[in-house]
Amino acid sequence: MALNLRKNHQILKIINDALIDLPTPSNISTWWNFGSLLGICLITQIVTGLLLAMHYTADTNLAFSSVAHMCRDVQFGWLIRNLHANGASFFFICIYLHIGRGLYYGSYLNKETWNIGVILLLTLMATAFVGYVLPWGQXSFWGATVITNLFSAIPYIGQTLVEWAWGGFSVDNPTLTRFFALHFLLPFVIVGLTLVHLTFLHETGSNNPLGIPSDCDKIPFHPYYTIKDILGFVLMLSLLVSLALFAPNLLGDPENFTPANPLVTPPHIKPEWYFLFAYAILRSIPNKLGGVLALAASILVLFLTPLLHTSKLRSMTFRPLSQILFWTLVANVLILTWVGSQPVEHPFIIIGQLASFTYFTIILILFPLAAALENKLLKL
């Protein structure tokens, strides 16, 4: 009998075991589509980014004009740029939904997969930040100045660290050049980490909405989930293309249409929408180092979720108290996002402080308490 190449060829075998013959729970819902959507986002960003890099000049005198030239004179350059800028937004929408799914269904109990995922989130945030600096508009320049300056809050070595990162005494040409180098490099780091993420995931197999072992009821990934994923791709790419064609600047800052000027500070310096929740947490602490620590903690707290799991049930499907807390947390993050976009004045300061406090309280205290209480109520 002839060998089946798909199952025996050294390289095809890896693809087969990951995308074709992979045993998958039969009941995973659409919330499990976001992993593959993130893969598509990554591919889209690398392709569009590569095409943009071919026309971009990483120099303070030329960066802004090179981006303008791309949009005016390069064939479909405007489309490539709009897809790349809005693709970042979709990347973050997908990753936040993916993390939310993981929190709700207890997927974080696959500890290695979860920890690599948090590292992936941090890498993605770094990539988006350095990328936002490249067009060298006002928001780019001042965003870079404000955020890199946060490192100066680190005791003793802070100032030295910031000047080393800048390559001088302020954000200038060396900063732009190194940010371009990093922005080119990091997506490939993300690809590598993604492969590690998948390797760990395929050691244990996917979780499912019931949070129970599904070894007795597995189906092959292809054709069931390949077709389901393709539907997800079509829907997401349709939304991305619609946004890029009909409202390309909807999520951007108008300030970035003004070339960078170190002598003029914009009235409101705020990051892109996907960083606003963390920015609100940073601003709600009236101390530089405290704010920086809270900002770091807002993401790093995800590393603690596997350690804080007290429930005897994995998923929240049958845990109404935890569900209420989960959706309160979602609303809380949306409030933080809104507060982060507002100026620092009376009602917003206190709302931001309350929302920041609630964010950490829910994750660190209320989730474990509610789960322990549910164990009691359900006599587990």
Curated annotation (Swiss-Prot):
Cofactor names: heme b
- Tell me any Pfam family this protein matches: Cytochrom_B_C
Nucleotide-binding among keywords: no
Any one GO CC term of the record: mitochondrial inner membrane
Question: What molecular function does GO assign, one term?
Answer: metal ion binding
InterPro entries assigned to the protein according to its UniProt record, in alphabetical order: Cyt_b/b6_C, Cyt_b/b6_C_sf, Cyt_b/b6_N, Cytb/b6-like_sf, Cytochrome_b, Cytochrome_b_C_euk/bac, Cytochrome_b_N_euk/bac, Di-haem_cyt_TM
Q: Which positions in this protein are listed as binding a ubiquinone?
A: H202
- Binding residue positions for heme b b562: H84, H183
User: Main location per UniProt?
Assistant: mitochondrion
Q: How is the cofactor bound?
A: Binds 2 heme b groups non-covalently.
Q: Does the keyword Chaperone apply?
A: no
GO BP annotations, alphabetical order: mitochondrial electron transport, ubiquinol to cytochrome c
Q: Sorted alphabetically, which keywords does the UniProt record give? A: Electron transport, Heme, Iron, Membrane, Metal-binding, Mitochondrion, Mitochondrion inner membrane, Respiratory chain, Transmembrane, Transmembrane helix, Transport, Ubiquinone
User: Which residues take part in binding heme b b566?
Assistant: H98, H197
Q: Which family is this sequence assigned to?
A: Belongs to the cytochrome b family.
Q: What is its quaternary makeup?
A: The cytochrome bc1 complex contains 11 subunits: 3 respiratory subunits (MT-CYB, CYC1 and UQCRFS1), 2 core proteins (UQCRC1 and UQCRC2) and 6 low-molecular weight proteins (UQCRH/QCR6, UQCRB/QCR7, UQCRQ/QCR8, UQCR10/QCR9, UQCR11/QCR10 and a cleavage product of UQCRFS1). This cytochrome bc1 complex then forms a dimer.
What is the stated purpose of this protein? Answer: Component of the ubiquinol-cytochrome c reductase complex (complex III or cytochrome b-c1 complex) that is part of the mitochondrial respiratory chain. The b-c1 complex mediates electron transfer from ubiquinol to cytochrome c. Contributes to the generation of a proton gradient across the mitochondrial membrane that is then used for ATP synthesis.
Protein name stated in the entry: Cytochrome b
Taxonomic lineage of the native organism: Eukaryota, Metazoa, Chordata, Craniata, Vertebrata
